[in-house]
Curated annotation (Swiss-Prot):
Protein name: UDP-2,3-diacylglucosamine hydrolase
Binding site for Mn(2+) 2: D41, N79, H114, H195
PANTHER family on file: UDP-2,3-DIACYLGLUCOSAMINE HYDROLASE, UDP-2,3-DIACYLGLUCOSAMINE HYDROLASE-RELATED
A cellular component annotation (GO) from this entry: extrinsic component of plasma membrane
Summary of the function given for this chain in its UniProt record: Hydrolyzes the pyrophosphate bond of UDP-2,3-diacylglucosamine to yield 2,3-diacylglucosamine 1-phosphate (lipid X) and UMP by catalyzing the attack of water at the alpha-P atom. Involved in the biosynthesis of lipid A, a phosphorylated glycolipid that anchors the lipopolysaccharide to the outer membrane of the cell.
Compartments in which it is found: Cell inner membrane
Short name of one Pfam family: Metallophos
Family: Belongs to the LpxH family.
Keyword Electron transport: no
Length: 240
């Protein structure tokens, strides 16, 4: 058996091929898993669980079908869908997890997270993140009419795209020291995360021993998953 991890699908109505690929994954590979973990940015944007977007409800139904088949599904918020709440979790059958979570998998302790908090050199983003994660700001935003939330979200996405275009690739990647610190805080030798869209397996030293950081790829032209079994940890890219 295996435990599967995915992240950064950025599902949206404008990208039906990615949606179809995700549905195929849920109905195929995922059905034989011990569990599925989605490490953030399942959706390109999320303005509230009350958004009537048919895509959201279709995906909730598809995930619920997986859960009902006996495969539990867990979710860590990303920087695009951090407002996913208990209502969508109930509809989809997913279990919401904290930003940093340690799993015991086949004899390994594995830290999982979205990965945006590791990009500590991007101080502008971290300042923005702190603001939008403030509870009263979220409460105020979710109280606004949907059409206003849509406008705000669109403006924020455009601003983020413009800001990122002028940032160096190094700034938008993880800070190596931040990686070591979080692994040592949780006393783990394995870390799986997404966010950077740079799939790879990195070797490092943490807790005075060899350690491994596995980065999931984004679902653009192909799918990306990490498969953890009793035999090892594998990063896999696959066609939709």
């Amino acid at each position: 058996m295996a435990t599967l991890f995915i992240a950064d699908l950025h599902l949206q109505t404008e990208e039906p091929a990615i949606t179809a690929g995700f549905l195929h994954f849920l109905q195929g590979e995922a059905r034989s898993a011990d569990a599925l973990y989605i490490l953030g940015d399942l959706f390109e944007a999320w303005i509230g669980d009350d958004d009537p977007n048919p895509l959201h409800h279709d995906m909730a139904a598809a995930i619920k079908a997986l859960v009902d088949s006996g495969v539990p599904c867990y979710f860590i918020h990303g920087n695009r869908d951090f407002l996913i709440g208990k209502r969508f979790a109930r509809e989809s059958g997913m279990t919401l997890l904290p930003d940093e979570n340690v799993l015991e998998l086949y004899g390994r302790n594995v830290l999982i997270m979205h990965g945006d908090t590791l990009c500590t050199d991007d101080t502008g983003y971290l300042a923005f993140r702190a603001k939008v994660h403030t509870p009263w700001i979220q409460t105020l935003f979710l109280a606004l009419p949907l059409f206003i939330r849509n406008r705000i979200a669109a403006k924020m996405r455009a601003g983020s795209k413009a800001a990122n275009s002028s940032k160096s690739m190094t700034i938008m990647d993880v800070n190596p020291q931040a990686v070591v610190e979080v692994m040592e805080k949780h006393r783990v030798q394995w870390l799986i995360h997404g966010h950077t869209h740079r799939p790879d397996v990195h070797q490092l030293t943490a807790n005075g021993e060899p350690a491994h950081r596995v980065v999931l790829g984004a679902w653009h032209s192909e799918g990306s998953m990490v498969k953890v079994t009793s035999e090892g940890v594998e990063l896999i890219q696959f066609p939709f």
